[in-house]
């Protein structure tokens, strides 16, 4: 059995889980060693360069290796299901952890506004990136897996263009475009705080 044949369709779920676990482990190692992804990477004009690079490189790899089982795996349903489940666990599970849950109570006791309270947290939770999960390496790698899956699935259907594929193409390309633009635009988002006096 060769390495290429081990990616056969009957093993797609198994390889999908292995790939996502590998991405999570690499992401966690990077998160604890390097820290979070700098916000400047997704600010203008770097987001344009990143977006164009992703589209050109992934499209080039797809066209060069479109008949390989690994490309079929990355653009297939098993990989999509695994990556969506893991992304859902990351966003709902880790995103619902509130590190500031005691701040309002402590602020009420001291008679100050919650935003004026000092934040003391477990340094490991901060290093894990729970204050801003979208800037963590492990989230970025899993999200990149979802973008690659949607892009490869769209390209696969676009090759054999038929009228019945139009809804599939619009649906998958639209979802890919929303996710892609949302991530690349997050570096330029500004959060402003306005205090109103009565």
Task: Give the predicted meaning of each segment.
Residues 1-198:
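Solvent-exposed, non-transmembrane regions of integral membrane proteins
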């Amino acid at each position: 059995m060769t390495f290429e044949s081990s990616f056969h369709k009957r093993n797609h779920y198994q390889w999908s889980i292995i790939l996502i676990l590998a991405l999570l482990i690499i992401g966690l190692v990077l998160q604890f060693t390097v820290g979070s992804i700098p916000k400047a990477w997704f600010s203008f004009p770097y987001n344009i360069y990143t977006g164009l690079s992703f589209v050109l490189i992934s499209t080039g790899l797809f066209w060069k290796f479109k008949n390989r089982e690994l490309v079929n795996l990355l653009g297939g349903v098993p990989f999509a299901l695994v990556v969506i489940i893991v992304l859902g666990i990351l966003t709902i599970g880790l995103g619902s952890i509130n590190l500031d849950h005691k701040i309002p109570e402590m602020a009420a006791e001291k008679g100050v506004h919650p935003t004026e309270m000092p934040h003391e947290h477990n340094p490991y939770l901060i290093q894990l990136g729970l204050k801003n999960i979208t800037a963590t390496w492990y989230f970025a790698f899993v999200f990149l897996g979802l973008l690659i899956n949607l892009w490869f699935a769209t390209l696969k259907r676009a090759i054999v263009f038929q009228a019945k594929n139009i809804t599939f193409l619009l649906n998958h390309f639209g979802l890919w475009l929303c996710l892609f633009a949302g991530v690349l635009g997050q570096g330029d988002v500004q959060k402003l705080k306005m205090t109103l006096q009565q």
